Amino acid sequence: MTFRARREVLRTILTGERCIHPGSVYDAISIRIAEDLGFELGMFGGSAASLAVLGDPDIALITLTELADQMRRMSRAATLPVLVDADHGYGNAMNVRRTVQELEAAGAAGLTIEDTLLPQAFGAAKPQLISLAEGIGKVKAALEGRGDPALVILGRTGAVSVTSLDDAIARARAYEACGVDGLFFTGITARDQLDAIAAATTLPIVLGGAPEHMSDLGYLAARRVRVALQGHAPIAAATQAVYETLKALRGGAAPKQLKGLPSAELTAQVMREAEVKRRLRVYLEPGS
């Protein structure tokens, strides 16, 4: 599937009538597993990227180059469309333009640009937002930076939990007026908040998370939520699995005593072993 085709799949999801959960992906193995299990979309979150690439928490330490390189590896490994958390665009509006270009070239189906002030400012006790004017500039730069018009650009705001619901709506409407393809919200914890946002905007909505009492897909779909994230449990589970395996080995366990290891069949599937063997026969065996 071409990069353009992957982007069209994401656009179809956003313009549809359903709400889906994406698979949280962060490397070649996780994206192949998500694809094999039938997920329609992958989500490459900033926290997962920081942990997978750097082993660090999500405090804006990862660079654009590191993020794009990891996205490129996933694009090569599978054809599952991926929505990328591009954080603040790695600088000002000029940097945002470059961010879009790099992630587009890396095969992202879509990306989010947020209005959080990143990295955290000196002396700041809690998250802060950039001004609406600067946020608009970043969104405009993102839209103008894409070479493929099919690349999905989402305006993202965390204003609901940082400033106010009214500010979140004002920012969302401003980003909508700029021409973004959808709106990404974090910090929504109550139905009346989502109801107000849905009533004040017209674009597809992506939720960065929602409490259990708001998890009904029918309710979310009726509020134009087309994608609802469920956190990044896969990388957390992988971390625990590696820890338990190494702990057992360090404690004297024999490899055959280890629990939770994948079957040979699953390992072969994730490695696409059958296809690799076919290529070896075709490319390297005489007379093939």
From Swiss-Prot:
UniProt keyword list: Decarboxylase, Lyase, Magnesium, Metal-binding
EC numbers for this chain: 4.1.1.112
InterPro entries: ICL/PEPM, Oxaloacetate_deCOase_bac, Pyrv/PenolPyrv_kinase-like_dom, Pyrv_kinase-like_dom_sf
Entry-linked Pfam families: PEP_mutase (PF13714)
Catalyses which reaction(s): oxaloacetate + H(+) = pyruvate + CO2
Cofactor note: Binds 1 Mg(2+) ion per subunit.
Residues holding substrate: S47, R156, H232
Cofactor: Mg(2+)
Residues binding Mg(2+): D85
Any GO BP: oxaloacetate metabolic process
Any GO MF annotation of the entry: methylisocitrate lyase activity
Gene3D superfamilies per record: Phosphoenolpyruvate-binding domains
Quaternary structure note: Homotetramer; dimer of dimers.
Family of this protein: Belongs to the isocitrate lyase/PEP mutase superfamily. Oxaloacetate decarboxylase family.
Record's function text: Catalyzes the decarboxylation of oxaloacetate into pyruvate. Seems to play a role in maintaining cellular concentrations of bicarbonate and pyruvate.
Protein name, as recorded: Oxaloacetate decarboxylase
Organism in which the protein naturally occurs: Bradyrhizobium sp. (strain BTAi1 / ATCC BAA-1182)
